[in-house]
Amino acid sequence: MALLNSATLEFVRSHADEDVRHLAFLADRFPGVDMPAALDQIRGRQVAKVKIPAWAAVDGIVYPPHLSLEQCSGEAAARYKARLVRRLGVQSLVDLTGGMGVDFSWMAREVSQATYVERQEWLCALAKENFPRLRLSHVEVRQGEAEALLPALP
Protein backbone atom coordinates (compact mmCIF):
# COMPACT_ATOMS: atom_id res chain seq x y z
CA MET A 1 0.00 0.00 0.00
CA ALA A 2 2.25 2.75 -1.25
CA LEU A 3 -0.43 5.33 -0.48
CA LEU A 4 0.05 4.73 3.26
CA ASN A 5 3.13 5.41 5.37
CA SER A 6 4.81 2.45 7.08
CA ALA A 7 3.37 3.23 10.55
CA THR A 8 -0.15 3.39 9.12
CA LEU A 9 0.36 0.20 7.13
CA GLU A 10 1.57 -1.65 10.23
CA PHE A 11 -1.37 -0.32 12.26
CA VAL A 12 -3.81 -1.54 9.58
CA ARG A 13 -2.28 -5.01 9.54
CA SER A 14 -2.16 -5.25 13.34
CA HIS A 15 -5.75 -4.13 13.87
CA ALA A 16 -7.44 -5.55 10.76
CA ASP A 17 -10.26 -7.32 12.58
CA GLU A 18 -10.95 -4.77 15.32
CA ASP A 19 -13.87 -2.39 15.70
CA VAL A 20 -12.99 0.88 13.94
CA ARG A 21 -15.24 2.84 16.32
CA HIS A 22 -13.04 1.73 19.22
CA LEU A 23 -9.81 2.27 17.28
CA ALA A 24 -10.79 5.87 16.50
CA PHE A 25 -10.41 6.70 20.19
CA LEU A 26 -6.79 5.48 20.16
CA ALA A 27 -5.50 8.09 17.70
CA ASP A 28 -3.48 9.96 20.36
CA ARG A 29 -1.52 6.79 21.16
CA PHE A 30 -0.30 6.43 17.55
CA PRO A 31 1.01 9.83 16.41
CA GLY A 32 2.73 8.45 13.30
CA VAL A 33 -0.44 6.79 12.05
CA ASP A 34 -2.74 8.54 9.60
CA MET A 35 -5.75 7.41 11.61
CA PRO A 36 -8.52 8.41 9.14
CA ALA A 37 -6.72 6.51 6.36
CA ALA A 38 -6.05 3.54 8.64
CA LEU A 39 -9.68 3.34 9.70
CA ASP A 40 -10.81 3.55 6.06
CA GLN A 41 -8.53 0.63 5.20
CA ILE A 42 -9.60 -1.51 8.16
CA ARG A 43 -13.30 -0.86 7.58
CA GLY A 44 -12.86 -1.29 3.84
CA ARG A 45 -11.34 -4.73 4.21
CA GLN A 46 -14.05 -5.73 6.67
CA VAL A 47 -16.76 -4.72 4.16
CA ALA A 48 -14.84 -6.36 1.31
CA LYS A 49 -14.72 -9.69 3.18
CA VAL A 50 -18.49 -9.85 2.67
CA LYS A 51 -19.01 -7.88 -0.54
CA ILE A 52 -15.89 -8.75 -2.58
CA PRO A 53 -14.18 -11.62 -0.74
CA ALA A 54 -11.68 -12.30 -3.53
CA TRP A 55 -10.31 -8.77 -3.11
CA ALA A 56 -10.23 -9.06 0.69
CA ALA A 57 -8.05 -12.15 0.31
CA VAL A 58 -5.37 -10.18 -1.57
CA ASP A 59 -2.75 -8.54 0.64
CA GLY A 60 -2.21 -4.86 0.02
CA ILE A 61 -5.48 -3.92 -1.65
CA VAL A 62 -6.17 -0.25 -0.99
CA TYR A 63 -9.80 0.56 -0.19
CA PRO A 64 -11.59 3.86 -0.79
CA PRO A 65 -13.66 5.70 1.82
CA HIS A 66 -16.82 3.95 2.90
CA LEU A 67 -19.27 5.53 0.43
CA SER A 68 -17.37 4.36 -2.66
CA LEU A 69 -17.15 0.86 -1.25
CA GLU A 70 -20.88 0.80 -0.54
CA GLN A 71 -21.67 1.98 -4.07
CA CYS A 72 -19.46 -0.52 -5.92
CA SER A 73 -20.75 -3.77 -7.35
CA GLY A 74 -20.47 -6.90 -5.31
CA GLU A 75 -18.38 -9.84 -6.41
CA ALA A 76 -21.36 -11.86 -7.67
CA ALA A 77 -22.52 -9.02 -9.95
CA ALA A 78 -18.99 -8.43 -11.23
CA ARG A 79 -18.52 -12.11 -12.04
CA TYR A 80 -21.85 -12.12 -13.88
CA LYS A 81 -20.76 -9.14 -16.00
CA ALA A 82 -17.51 -10.95 -16.78
CA ARG A 83 -19.49 -13.94 -18.05
CA LEU A 84 -21.42 -11.60 -20.35
CA VAL A 85 -18.15 -10.20 -21.71
CA ARG A 86 -16.87 -13.75 -22.28
CA ARG A 87 -20.04 -14.64 -24.23
CA LEU A 88 -19.60 -11.59 -26.45
CA GLY A 89 -16.19 -12.89 -27.49
CA VAL A 90 -14.63 -9.43 -27.69
CA GLN A 91 -10.89 -8.82 -27.36
CA SER A 92 -10.98 -5.33 -25.85
CA LEU A 93 -12.97 -3.53 -23.20
CA VAL A 94 -13.33 0.08 -22.05
CA ASP A 95 -15.04 0.82 -18.74
CA LEU A 96 -16.04 4.50 -18.92
CA THR A 97 -17.21 4.66 -15.30
CA GLY A 98 -14.42 2.76 -13.55
CA GLY A 99 -15.25 3.68 -9.96
CA MET A 100 -13.53 1.37 -7.51
CA GLY A 101 -12.77 -1.05 -10.35
CA VAL A 102 -14.58 -4.13 -9.07
CA ASP A 103 -16.57 -4.82 -12.27
CA PHE A 104 -13.55 -3.90 -14.37
CA SER A 105 -11.26 -6.28 -12.47
CA TRP A 106 -13.37 -9.28 -13.46
CA MET A 107 -14.36 -8.18 -16.96
CA ALA A 108 -10.74 -7.34 -17.84
CA ARG A 109 -9.76 -10.98 -17.30
CA GLU A 110 -11.92 -11.92 -20.28
CA VAL A 111 -10.16 -9.71 -22.85
CA SER A 112 -6.64 -9.12 -24.10
CA GLN A 113 -6.81 -5.31 -23.82
CA ALA A 114 -8.75 -3.38 -21.17
CA THR A 115 -8.97 0.33 -20.39
CA TYR A 116 -10.32 1.74 -17.13
CA VAL A 117 -11.55 5.34 -17.28
CA GLU A 118 -12.44 7.35 -14.19
CA ARG A 119 -12.84 11.09 -13.71
CA GLN A 120 -11.75 11.12 -10.07
CA GLU A 121 -7.97 11.19 -9.77
CA TRP A 122 -7.90 9.48 -6.38
CA LEU A 123 -9.89 6.48 -7.69
CA CYS A 124 -7.40 6.21 -10.57
CA ALA A 125 -4.58 6.19 -8.02
CA LEU A 126 -6.30 3.34 -6.16
CA ALA A 127 -6.80 1.45 -9.43
CA LYS A 128 -3.10 1.81 -10.29
CA GLU A 129 -2.23 0.39 -6.87
CA ASN A 130 -4.78 -2.42 -6.88
CA PHE A 131 -4.79 -3.77 -10.44
CA PRO A 132 -1.22 -5.15 -10.29
CA ARG A 133 -2.05 -6.83 -6.97
CA LEU A 134 -5.05 -8.40 -8.71
CA ARG A 135 -2.69 -9.67 -11.46
CA LEU A 136 -4.11 -7.37 -14.12
CA SER A 137 -1.02 -6.49 -16.11
CA HIS A 138 -2.73 -5.88 -19.46
CA VAL A 139 -4.83 -2.93 -18.35
CA GLU A 140 -4.53 0.81 -18.80
CA VAL A 141 -5.83 3.42 -16.36
CA ARG A 142 -6.90 6.80 -17.76
CA GLN A 143 -8.09 9.72 -15.69
CA GLY A 144 -10.57 12.21 -17.14
CA GLU A 145 -14.08 12.77 -18.39
CA ALA A 146 -15.28 9.89 -20.56
CA GLU A 147 -16.63 12.25 -23.21
CA ALA A 148 -13.26 13.96 -23.61
CA LEU A 149 -11.31 10.69 -23.69
CA LEU A 150 -13.59 8.74 -26.06
CA PRO A 151 -11.96 9.86 -29.33
CA ALA A 152 -8.55 8.58 -28.18
CA LEU A 153 -9.71 5.26 -26.72
CA PRO A 154 -9.04 1.94 -28.47
Regions found by a protein language model. Give the residues of each.
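SAM-dependent transferase fold signal centered on methyltransferase-like domains
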Residues: M1-P154
